[in-house]
Every structure is written in C-alpha cells, then in structure tokens.
Regions:
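Generic detection of intrinsically disordered/low-complexity segments and helix-coil linkers/edges
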Residues: 6-9, 131, 234
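Charged, glycine/proline-rich intrinsically disordered loops and linkers
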Residues: 12-46, 123-141, 252-278
Length: 318
C-alpha cells in the first residue's frame, strides 16, 4: 500500500467521495482489474485459481485496510491493526461468496464495517460514501465502536474475547447449506471458551461442520502473549488437530517474503508485487479448500500468520 499522497483524480466513483489520499495506479490494473469478476449474477469468483481472481482479492484486501484507516482516522478512535492482519482472509472468503462472517474480536469493528460498506449493506442505513461512513463512525445513530448485530449485513455483536464462535456454530446448525466463518484473534485463542465450544458442539452434532474458524495469528495480543508468540507453525497446527479438526490450512506470510531477512511475523504488504500475488493466491487457495471441506462434512480451520498492523502501520502494531 502506498504512503505517497497523489493528486485527486479528475473522476472517481461516487462512493469514494470523502477519500483523502490517492495512490498511483496499481500494477497490472488494466489487464487484471479492468472487468470485475463479481456482479449481480455472479456472487462468487468463477475460478478462484485464476490470476484475475487473485489480483482482485488483493485489491479487495487493500481496500479493506484503507477504509479501516479512513474510519478510525475520522474520529481518532479505533483499532486498525488487528483487522489489517486478517484483511486478506476476509477478502478471500467474501469473494468466494461466504459472507455470513462473524468475529469474536470487538476491536475489528472498523474492518467489518468497511466490508459491509464495500458490499453496499450500509446503504440501508443511509451510508453511501466514504464521507458518510467517516461521519457515522462512533456515533449512537451510526457505527458503534464494537460490532452490533443491528448493523445491516452483520449477523452478531462482538466484544468479549472468545465469544464469536457461538454465533457461527448456531448459524451452522440452523442453516446447514451455508458456511459460517468466524475470525479469532490471538487473545481470543487464549480464552478457554473457544476450543471448549468447538469440542462440545462437535460431540453433540458431529455431522454439522459448516463453520470455519479463521485464526488471525499475528504475534501480539493484549493478553495471553506466551501462547501466541512462542509457538511455531507445527505446534499451532498440532493444537488444532488435537482438538479434533480434520484439516488445518495454515498460510505463513514469511514463506512468500522476497527478502532473506523477513521476521517471523512478516508483513505481506511490504513484499514486491509478484510476492504479494503469490501470498494472496495461497490465501485464496487455502480459504477455498477449507470452505469446501467444511461444507462437505470435515472440520477445517484457516490460519493466517502475518504481522499485526500489516499495511496500516509502518512497522506493525505492538
């Protein structure tokens, strides 16, 4: 993501009104971004492995990060860093057509509001432009600091750590032909409720698997630091398998870094264009595979490991 301020374009879509900074044109935009792959008659990517699908997922992830900054900056309030680590996974699942997404991370509210803005859900409450969204953030008549299930497009509230999976499990039980992803943060994973809930549900309803935990593993948390920062990939994957998950789809940003000195928790947004495409392609492939398995009777989870604050902080959120 560019930090350079550019002049305002002569023309831009009406919903962009209120955006304060514009970057140079994204690489390959004319070849891979000229025509949207999604539309009124195409709610999901027709081919998740295509170069255009990967490219447009990358654009969506950066759009989510940028809008999150716009929203939090408007009122000098909110937490953009945590959601930024999950933006790639959220974008991938949305473009794959899986939009019944909940979270246990109340601080991710600005990112989820940004997703609802991009899919036009917020138009039902009179939010049509970026300026509208900035104005209505952190207002009683608008977008609350923590998620509210009363916001169009959102299925459930979020706030207390470790509580979001209950909503995903309930949705999966009631609507077994749909996928219910739930994003889980580092802090939330340290709460006992999450794995306990998954275990109890699997015991009671072993045939209901259409939920997908999405762990945002970024190495920082307000609590439970030892668990999130000291484990390696093998131990993390083993932890989920030990709790009965059939498949663990783990994508580590460091594996795609184009510099030899990438830290353990790498920031994918600092990679070159080719490396960013490779990382996004891996996210999209893993999200697609995990989703298909969850909808086919196998317990699956998706783990994305990268630096907290990826793309919205100069050196990550600490």
């Amino acid at each position: 993501m560019s930090a350079q301020m550019q002049s305002t374009p002569e023309t831009f879509p009406a919903f962009c009104e209120g955006i304060q900074y514009f970057a140079d044109s994204f690489p390959e935009i004319d070849r891979l971004g000229a025509e949207p792959l999604l539309g009124p008659d195409q709610p999901a990517l027709p081919d998740a492995s295509s170069e255009a699908a990967i490219y447009q997922t990358l654009l969506a992830a950066d759009a989510l990060r940028y809008l999150t900054l716009q929203v939090t900056g408007a009122k000098s309030s909110g937490h953009p860093g945590g959601f930024a680590s999950s933006a790639d996974a959220v974008a991938a699942l949305h473009l794959l057509g899986h939009r019944n997404m909940v979270t246990e991370v109340g601080h991710h509210a600005p990112g989820f509001y940004s997703a609802m803005f991009l899919d036009t859900s917020l138009e039902d409450m009179g939010i049509h432009t970026v300026s509208d969204m900035r104005t209505r953030f952190r207002e009683r008549h608008g977008l609350l600091g923590h998620l509210s299930g009363a916001i169009p497009g959102l299925l459930a509230p979020a706030g207390p750590l470790g509580q979001g999976q209950h909503f995903a499990l309930a949705g999966a039980y009631l609507h077994r032909d749909k996928l219910f992803p739930v994003t889980i943060g580092d802090g939330g994973l340290g709460e006992p409720y999450i794995m306990s809930a998954f275990q109890h549900f699997a015991t009671a309803y072993p045939d209901v698997t259409n939920y997908l935990p999405v762990l945002v593993w970024n190495g920082y948390s307000q609590e439970h630091h030892s668990m999130v920062s000291l484990w390696d990939n093998g131990r993390m994957a083993g932890y989920w398998r030990a709790h009965g998950f059939d498949e663990v789809h783990l994508v580590d940003a460091r594996d795609f870094a184009d510099t030899p000195d990438a830290p353990v928790y790498a920031d994918s947004t600092t990679f070159g264009f080719a490396a960013r495409m490779a990382f996004t392609g891996a996210i999209l492939k893993a999200a697609d595979a995990a989703s298909r398995s969850a909808l086919s009777g196998r317990r699956a989870c998706l783990i994305v490991k990268q630096l907290k604050g990826a793309g919205v902080h100069a050196t990550g959120a600490k």
